[in-house]
């Protein structure tokens, strides 16, 4: 019984850490028909499909992504601001294993967009 409780405690303590440590993979915008692929080893994300704006496929939308050393599940980098035509500061967080929040910042204004992890692009 003690071993079973210890195993359960370990699973509860270490599972969120394992999930929050990896944002690599394919993500779908929660509201729009757009998909990105994050390659954390390259520190970037590229549009792999966008049904509304197909000309954006192949565009690098996130770059210079680096893990926050003081907070697990948080990354900082740059996001491409379409209307400005340049990269701006971004904060990426992983509140759940399959849910990502991307918060772009321009001056004192910010916008957060939710993305959902997917296995395939459909």
Model region roles, listed by residue range:
Residues 15-17:
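N-terminal signal peptide c-region/cleavage motif recognized by signal peptidases
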Residues 91-112:
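Short, exposed beta-strand-loop hairpins at the edges of beta-sheets
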Residues 23-89, 116, 120:
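Central antiparallel beta-sheet cores of small beta-barrel/beta-sandwich binding domains
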Residues 1-7:
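Bacterial N-terminal signal peptides that target proteins for export
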